[in-house]
């Protein structure tokens, strides 16, 4: 059963990709979606057996690398962390497959699209279920390639090409550090198997742990879009909307967080690493929340909310609250998938329009889609008793419960980010559904709700966005729960959940919720009641400066393009001119041909046609040969040998000039 969870998505991908013309579009839909739904059902059974019944499963298929100093096996581990990740990955992926049947109905390359989707899911399952870091790396690289194929699915569009290459290139930076980190683990621990590495982690030098932790962190930052390696994430919106839902909800961006969670027995012994992770997460949450305030693309607003939520997850990891991070990861998968799929329903129903400034007044035309986006936005802003509330607010509480500088700063940055998150979430709702209609009249005349095959995933995700947090809270983060005790490690000094639950002032616990309600109300007031205020705010120099800074996304793209890319191109030009076309050309092909041509002409001058010259050459050759053959070894380079060489050279020089030039 456990191997079937992994094998079924790959089987569906292979059949749809290799036999797509034989089975047709409908066949590709049935096979890939059926395989994913079967895997999702089996993952629920696995969650019950492994997670709830406490029966971890380890499966070894065979040996991969077997040498004197390294043994890497094709092994898979199903513990409570693995099955907890399988739930959002497979449930969201199966719903995305079902949703895509209608959403991609008009595309001529359905078989290829569904093959890529299933392959993406398969590699994510390999990453999650592998029992060593090398198997994880196979899945890690697999989802990277799959994301490129999906983002660049419409490869005739220049922006899609650029977005795909950008995602692949930025992630390649993280992959380089990650691969070095994995080999550092092998060098320090002598193994890459989880059980072997984690068992000796407490006895390893702290400096080595810190270096390994930072290397793993850079890899996770690229994959989970934390600053400064976040720039690929908004551009990934060039792919089809189902791809956005799959990448941003349950697969690609969660891989980096999963790496940190799985490596908790290592990074727990590196306090410097934990502080750096906390700061990276807090700054990412704040940056993405401020940048999302001014985005006008429907999908990009949700993309920046994903980036912000990844910051919250990293913040929880840096605070050593791994169970809280996992809980928010699962919650986030459901309400973020709901937001993206509902946004796709808006785009689908409004003639592919996704500019917020060209929408408005859709609440009467798309009431069900409005309800779905409203539920997702309320869960994202952590409205009390929605799914997001039970994990997002808890992250801020445990940050304040640390009673450390990094934790306190993380709390305040996270709280401010929560206000901004609520603001841009309801800015999206207001501009899309409440404001004056701004789209062409024909778009409204043809506006329509999504068909039933799209409605079903939205209904399921809406229910999960409302009730899942309440149902799973005690299991994941309840006081005294041992659900994740065998999969995650938390040092006793870092346990602050009790303090966060019972020791903090009530005002500090309610402040994020109050701020979120204020941000949501402010957005509705500014964009629905008095929209003219938003224009006047940018008239002054300060307002215009802030607007320009946030609208330029903190100038990260300009920094990379101007400082790194342009400098690299200039250095490449200099290298090309000075070395490749300069030194190498002179000493290489051009210089070698010149030297050989000159040497050939010099040798040709000795072809004089004079018999006495030839006799001299023959005599010198014979004398030299006799000397080299019969002379003792120690005499070759003594005074006799040198004398013979001088005689030989003198004979060449003293030849009559007429003989040498005739």
Curated annotation (Swiss-Prot):
The chain crosses the membrane at residues 40-62, 77-99, 112-129, 133-155, 168-190, 200-222, 243-262, 272-294, 301-320, 325-347, 360-382, 408-430, 450-472, 510-529, 609-631, 636-658. Gene3D superfamilies: 1.20.5.2700. It catalyses: a ubiquinone + NADH + 5 H(+)(in) = a ubiquinol + NAD(+) + 4 H(+)(out). GO terms for cellular component: mitochondrial inner membrane. GO terms for molecular function: NADH dehydrogenase (ubiquinone) activity. Pfam families: NADH5_C, Proton_antipo_M, Proton_antipo_N. It is a multi-pass membrane protein. It comes from the Eukaryota. Keywords: Electron transport, Membrane, Mitochondrion, Mitochondrion inner membrane, NAD, Respiratory chain, Translocase, Transmembrane, Transmembrane helix, Transport, Ubiquinone. It is found in: Mitochondrion inner membrane. Its EC number is 7.1.1.2. It is an enzyme of class 7 (translocase). GO terms for biological process: ATP synthesis coupled electron transport; electron transport coupled proton transport. Core subunit of the mitochondrial membrane respiratory chain NADH dehydrogenase (Complex I) that is believed to belong to the minimal assembly required for catalysis. Complex I functions in the transfer of electrons from NADH to the respiratory chain. The immediate electron acceptor for the enzyme is believed to be ubiquinone. Belongs to the complex I subunit 5 family. This is NADH-ubiquinone oxidoreductase chain 5.
